[in-house]
Amino acid sequence: AEIVAFDLDSRFVSPEQAERRFRHAAACVKPARLIYKTVDSTLRGNLGPETRGALTGSGRRLAIVAPAFPDAGRTTVGGRQYVDGVALEQTAFARDPKNPIVTSYVMERMAGLEPTRFQVFDAAGNGELDELVGRIGIAEPVVWVGSPGLAAALSRALSPEENAPLAQPPLRASKVLVAIGSLHPANDAQLASLRQAGAVLVTLPEAADPEAVAQEVRAAFARADVVCLMSPRSRAAAADHAAALGAVVSRCTPAFDGL
């Protein structure tokens, strides 16, 4: 295969487990031309231990860390991460129930990895990410660490012809299910816009019966082309809510063609 991807589910495990998972995964693809370790653009999770594991497993000495995702308003300026111009620790992400953020400094979020083994790069736009990739070079034996922004820059460098505009627009879904499991205020604004445009809201109750809620979702598609399924608004039992949300979605797949 040209691309091998690992879903290591390491955000909520201990730092030791996260490092071990990444070390084993990186060892499996050690000869690869390019090794890319994804990070959340709001710096949640075990960033330092994961990167340490990727470096150890791959045998590479240096990580290039550029977590900016300009298309989503996430930028890195002066080594600090911003969301729509607001320092990370001043945003709603600071109150994440599982991964509260107390600092926007990328260096501090990389704790657990020796400073000599990684370099942090600023980027406020896609052009800066493209320049970074060009400056380091695709062939350099490093571990790239970033969000979708850096991944897109690497893709543009690897296959510029494949990133040309599409000759035809992609097909549009006729029935769309919007699953909302985040408590971020931005989701409330997005949900309000969707409902104003005619979307139907189905709220997942506490201790829900997935099949009963799935029936409600399927019935809602008879009235609207867009149905929003929202998890309970409490921060307690977030993992249970996520599992219930997934159980409902899996039972509704015949009813929609866009998610």
Q: Predicted segment positions?
A:
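Cap/lid and interdomain-hinge subdomains that line or gate substrate/regulatory clefts
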Residues: 2, 13-35, 39-143
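Short amphipathic alpha-helices and their capping/turn segments at secondary-structure boundaries
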Residues: 55-62, 213-222
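N-terminal glycine-rich anion-binding loops that anchor highly charged ligand groups
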Residues: 1-5, 228
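Anion-binding catalytic surfaces of enzymes that hydrolyze or transfer phosphate/sulfate esters
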Residues: 199-202, 215-232
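Conserved, well-structured core segments that form the ligand-binding/active-site neighborhood
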Residues: 81-215
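Short glycine-rich anion-binding loops that position phosphate/pyrophosphate groups of nucleotides
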Residues: 10-12, 40-42, 149-150, 183, ...
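Hydrophobic alpha/beta core scaffold segments
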Residues: 34-37, 146, 223, 227, ...
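Glycine-rich phosphate/diphosphate-binding loops that line cofactor/substrate pockets in enzymes
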Residues: 27-31, 138, 169-172, 217-224
